[in-house]
Amino acid sequence: DGWAYDIGFGGLDHVLASGENVNVMVFDTEMYSNTGGQASKASNIGEVCQFAAAGKETSKKSLSEIAMSYGYVYVAQIALGANPAQAVKAITEAEAYPGPSLIIGYAPCELHGIAKGGMNHCQDEMKKAVKAGYWNLFSFNPALKAEGKNPFTLTSKEGDGSYQEFLNNEARYTRLVKPFPERAERLFAKSEEVAKERYEHLQKLVELYK
């Protein structure tokens, strides 16, 4: 959860930097789920949780790119419900990679307050997150560089325009609308804009690593 992005980040970074053959999987709930739903550097813009009662103003940390900056860490973002094949492939590659690996999996949480079906539909919620462009699927495999191949693979496509619909299906966002309607509109628009910029950045990484 938020631990990996925040109070536990120093330890995680030390493990990845060591170069040891260690596999790490982070279940990204975008908050501190185990301690009751506090805001973290994993939390997204506009998200309402403890310590961010008026919606988080800033965007989430790019944990994946920090790990990728070492150049020798296998990194992947997955969402099992959205693309099981990509998730299994990433896990298999991470296990086979002779060095540190980090897999960040999108993890719907009870505290997200999924409106339609709750956690019974968490797999569908993952699909919606990827389809909307809220969560991106990609992998960075340093081993491919030695084979003369592009180590960065972007699997997910650009958002289909359902970003606001996705936000409005989760109480962690909609609970901002009634008390602060203008702020909610501004933060939700900002969140979508940042998501589009993030995807454009990922597309540029595909070209950069060629």
Regions found by a protein language model. Name each.
Residues M119-K210:
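Conserved acidic/glycine
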